[in-house]
């Protein structure tokens, strides 16, 4: 079983959303708005997973009472085109929370791939691999949730207490998450859609 650090995954996702929405605004509303992509293209379990994390980190936030579309609008994942009244998902909304098929239709060159080349035995090429195989909706939020624990599971977690709360996070874990987050943020997914993460024993 993979244990998810809700706080860490939430902050990774929050940072990516802010960066993608900011970049879209800088390039203009046309790039931000995806015509014909609606809430039907959102993977609701993915969005609900993020909302659980959001509520955990912001228990009193007013957005917690919004429906899914209104919540996405507040994040910048869904917009209304004021020129003609049309509405739909943004690039950030689809990439972060979309169903796999609409994501692949809109970004047909996008590939998300994780390969673990650590702890190899004999002539093994890899000890673990995550790629799209039809068992998960391949959006960025799911990729984050599945890859971050794999990247950090071999890093020791010393027993530390913050008052009565156990503190498991370390500078090493934070550095790995930050590097992973920056890789995605700085990748131009509208041009070059390859997200490839490789893990080694000695790198």
PLM feature segments, named:
Residues 2-193, 198-203:
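Active-site helix-to-loop segments that bind/position phosphate- or nucleotide-bearing substrates
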């Amino acid at each position: 079983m993979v244990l998810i650090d809700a706080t860490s995954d939430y902050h990774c996702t929050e940072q990516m959303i802010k960066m993608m929405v900011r970049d879209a605004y800088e390039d203009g509303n046309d790039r931000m708005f995806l015509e014909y992509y609606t809430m039907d293209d959102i993977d609701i379990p993915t969005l609900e997973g993020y909302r659980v994390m959001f509520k955990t980190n912001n228990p009193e936030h007013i957005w917690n009472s919004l429906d899914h579309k209104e919540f996405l609008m507040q994040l910048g994942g869904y917009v209304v085109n004021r020129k003609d009244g049309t509405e739909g998902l943004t690039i950030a909304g689809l990439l972060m929370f979309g169903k796999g098929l609409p994501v692949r239709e809109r970004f047909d060159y996008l590939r998300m791939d994780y390969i673990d080349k650590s702890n190899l035995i004999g002539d093994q090429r890899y000890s673990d691999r995550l790629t799209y195989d039809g068992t998960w909706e391949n959006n960025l939020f799911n990729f984050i949730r599945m890859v971050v624990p794999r990247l950090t599971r071999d890093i020791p977690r010393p027993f530390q207490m913050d008052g009565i709360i156990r503190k498991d996070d370390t500078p090493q874990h934070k550095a790995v998450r930050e590097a992973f987050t920056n890789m995605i943020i700085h990748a131009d997914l509208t041009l070059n859609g390859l997200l490839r993460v490789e893990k080694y024993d000695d790198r």
